[in-house]
Amino acid sequence: MAGVLGMILAGGEGSRLRPLTESRTKPAVPFGGSYRLIDFALNNFVNADLMRIYVLTQFKSQSLFQHMKKGWNVNGITDRFIDPVPAQMRTGKRWYEGTADAIYQNISFIESTDPEHVCIFGSDHIYKMDIRQMLDFHKKKKAALTVSALRMPAKDASGFGVIEVDEHGKMIGFEEKPSNPKCIPGQPGIALVSMGNYIFEAESLCKELIHDAALEDSSHDFGKDIIPKMFPEGNVYVYDFSTNHIKGEKKEVYWRDVGTIESYWEAHMDLLKKDAPFSLYNRKWPLHTYYPPLPPATFSDSDNGRVQIIDSLVCGGSYIRGSRIEKSVLGFRSNIASACDISESILLGNVKVGKGCVLRRVIVDKGADIAPGTEIGVNLQEDKKRYHVSDEGIVVIPKGERVGY
């Protein structure tokens, strides 16, 4: 896509997703067995033929770098790149202080590539979006800035930027994370919220970033500072995400913020529904990632009974013997011994589960080893003495943990 530069904000610490983010940045957290969270933003860009992309990182980014090197390397293709960019303190000895500051500290990339438009997207949501449709809207409106937005219950909107628009799609109000979100006129209980995805006219973006960087009282954030300053000037528009159409799909648009353990678990359960609202199987919108060279998953009966796999996803290299797996996602190289009963659980890969284990609503991080006969998620009071248990009763086993030994 000529004249367009993509910049993906991938520096999120992800504190609400701990312990899954203890050793990795939030965009590097595995999802859906085969993917990382960053993959969904990257696929939205690549499937829209937007192939000049900088991925701005900051915290604990090594696993993200490794994933991108293996799965997203387009070196050698003229004028196409997907480059991770670590925080380099180009404008002083300081980390990124906000989302706008992250772009400002890398403004040289905008200046050197000289695009007409800059797409700035987040990297920690699960959704599909044909960015070309949002860009067409942005160009048609001749906007300085276009913000993508969706409707959600007002009771859930206080963690987002809440938007007001006129009949032409122009932004006429914006409040970042309000305690009492305003509802859409005529739609009681429903608010219009920012998805954290922006398309800027490049010259306007650079102008606003330079101005904001000089303000000592600014938090240097798009939602808190840039958007509230720009929209009263009258050239900020709002793109309705519900109008976005993905080839090969007839369902309503799907968007999920996976910033908490509960929402992360729920998004996985969405994948396993009979009529899943988010499909991994659309050939017209392929979901690229790094897939290691592994043999197919193997299922075998044992002396303890037949293997049963019900409403589940199982990735390559996995070996399951005589156990029952229901409504669960098993990542690469999951090794499940016989007589186990695993339900509504997520194994992130290279996990060993010994004979006769019971797992209920458990997230097991990579490399964990669970001893035979262990029960997790059955007695939450006991689990809380040893592991992180969310308010909703989801148990999280940390990366590399040896359980029950």
From Swiss-Prot:
The family database entries (SUPFAM superfamilies) matched by this protein are listed as: Nucleotide-diphospho-sugar transferases, Trimeric LpxA-like enzymes
Q: Which residues cross the membrane?
A: none
Pathway as given in its UniProt record: Glycan biosynthesis; glycogen biosynthesis
- State its Enzyme Commission number(s): 2.7.7.27
What Gene3D superfamilies does the annotation carry? Hexapeptide repeat proteins (2.160.10.10), Spore Coat Polysaccharide Biosynthesis Protein SpsA, Chain A (3.90.550.10)
Enumerate the UniProt keywords alphabetically: ATP-binding, Carbohydrate metabolism, Glycogen biosynthesis, Glycogen metabolism, Nucleotide-binding, Nucleotidyltransferase, Transferase
Enzymatic class: transferase
PROSITE patterns attached here?
ADP_GLC_PYROPHOSPH_1 (PS00808), ADP_GLC_PYROPHOSPH_2 (PS00809), ADP_GLC_PYROPHOSPH_3 (PS00810)
Q: Single Gene Ontology BP term?
A: glycogen biosynthetic process
**A Pfam family the protein falls into:** Hexapep_GlmU
InterPro entries of this UniProt entry?
ADP-Glc_PPase, ADP_Glu_pyroP_CS, GlgC_bac, GlmU/GlgC-like_hexapep, NTP_transferase_dom, Nucleotide-diphossugar_trans, Trimer_LpxA-like_sf
Please describe what this protein does: Involved in the biosynthesis of ADP-glucose, a building block required for the elongation reactions to produce glycogen. Catalyzes the reaction between ATP and alpha-D-glucose 1-phosphate (G1P) to produce pyrophosphate and ADP-Glc.
- Stated family: Belongs to the bacterial/plant glucose-1-phosphate adenylyltransferase family.
Q: Which HAMAP family match?
A: GlgC
Subunit record text? Homotetramer.
Q: Can you say what this protein is called?
A: Glucose-1-phosphate adenylyltransferase
Q: Which species does this protein come from?
A: Aliivibrio fischeri (strain ATCC 700601 / ES114) (Vibrio fischeri)
